[in-house]
Amino acid sequence: MSQPIYKRILLKLSGEALQGEDGLGIDPAILDRMAVEIKELVEMGVEVGVVLGGGNLFRGAKLAKAGMNRVVGDHMGMLATVMNGLAMRDSLFRADVNAKLMSAFQLNGICDTYNWSEAIKMLREKRVVIFSAGTGNPFFTTDSTACLRGIEIEADVVLKATKVDGVYDCDPAKNPDAKLYKNLTYAEVIDKELKVMDLSAFTLARDHGMPIRVFNMGKPGALRQVVTGTEEGTTIC
């Protein structure tokens, strides 16, 4: 088996990546496959932190446009990420992976409150740490959470799992001739206005020199290939 090129990673999974063909909720089969792929990394000695989105259950920004207070909507979205985190933790447990769920705010009896030093300790013990509830503040996306937590835990890279094979020059769903980039600099992403993640999250990663790799989590084995250094997906640094 190929050796990993990263010691510690932060894996960002969108809520949409967890939903099945009906486009809503959580598909247990997808969740279990992701848990098995994460288990492979743990068995290779990689320390894994995970940030989950909540878009499969709730989108605060969308309802804000319909008149809901944005702060209320974002709080509901944060709780959706906790629900996804609970599902992921359960799936990892069933795969015999030791995992800990942390929330950015207190949810006594459900999960631990985020604590930086405790998270580092658990990662060193080869426990998967799932970070939920975003940053704990409204107006920040889970992409921002992924970059923030990645920087805090001193991850080697943020791995952004998507439904496409990486970063393209245009939408591959609309243009079959879309070009896939293998390597990009932070400046190229901004200059070309490529949709990698929201600007706040991206500039946070850039300012702290945090590499980002974008890949297709729907492709079996892609996560392992990214971690072992193949040219899977797009690398931004």
From Swiss-Prot:
Q: Where does UMP bind?
A: G54, D74, T135, G136, N137, P138, F139, F140, T141, T142
Protein localization: Cytoplasm
GO MF annotations for this entry? ATP binding; UMP kinase activity
* Reaction it catalyzes: UMP + ATP = UDP + ADP
Q: Anything known on activity regulation?
A: Allosterically activated by GTP. Inhibited by UTP.
Q: Which UniProt keywords apply?
A: Allosteric enzyme, ATP-binding, Cytoplasm, Kinase, Nucleotide-binding, Pyrimidine biosynthesis, Transferase
Task: List the Pfam families hit by this protein, alphabetically.
Answer: AA_kinase
Task: Output a single Gene Ontology CC term carried by this record.
Answer: cytosol
Q: What is its EC number?
A: 2.7.4.22
* Record has Oxidoreductase as a keyword: no
UniProt key word Calcium: no
Q: Please describe what this protein does.
A: Catalyzes the reversible phosphorylation of UMP to UDP.
Q: Which family does it belong to?
A: Belongs to the UMP kinase family.
Its name, as the record gives it, is Uridylate kinase
Tell me what organism the protein belongs to. Answer: Haemophilus influenzae (strain 86-028NP)
